[in-house]
């Protein structure tokens, strides 16, 4: 059994690392942390161009159809840069949740989420929320 990352995984990781270093320098990160938005739309847009929001979405829905291992490599790079944003809740929680459903309206939401056109997150409801 092989436990090493593939060349494709490492190349994608390196591309995200380079992108994050370019679009999210420390001054930009400080501005986001001090602001009210909680993420940098410009950085999110660049990540979306690379397919990161839809990394776990099936290719038929416009996603990359990759695995959780691939996503962890990307999350690690975003964490290394302290990039604020909805990556975990969007790409690791919401997109796979949408992908597990069915129906035309759900497919449309999944496609929009996979492309990064919309941001999706999970919310809690109920007395303990």
Model feature map: region roles:
Residues 9, 20:
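Conserved S/T- and glycine-rich ATP-binding loop of Class I adenylate-forming
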Residues 1-8:
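Intrinsic disorder at enzyme termini
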Residues 21, 26-129:
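Glycine-rich flavin
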């Amino acid at each position: 059994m092989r436990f090493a990352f593939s060349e494709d995984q490492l190349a994608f990781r390196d591309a995200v690392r380079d992108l994050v270093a370019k679009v999210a320098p420390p001054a930009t990160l400080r501005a986001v942390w001090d602001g009210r938005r909680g993420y940098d739309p410009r950085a999110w847009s660049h990540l979306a161009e690379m397919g990161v929001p839809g990394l776990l979405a099936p290719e038929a829905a416009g996603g990359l159809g990759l695995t959780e291992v691939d996503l962890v490599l990307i999350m690690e790079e975003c964490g290394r840069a302290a990039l604020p944003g909805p990556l975990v809740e969007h790409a690791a929680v919401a997109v796979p949740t949408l992908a597990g459903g069915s129906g035309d309206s759900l497919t449309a939401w999944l496609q929009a989420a996979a492309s990064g056109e919309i941001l999706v997150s999970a919310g809690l409801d109920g007395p303990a929320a």
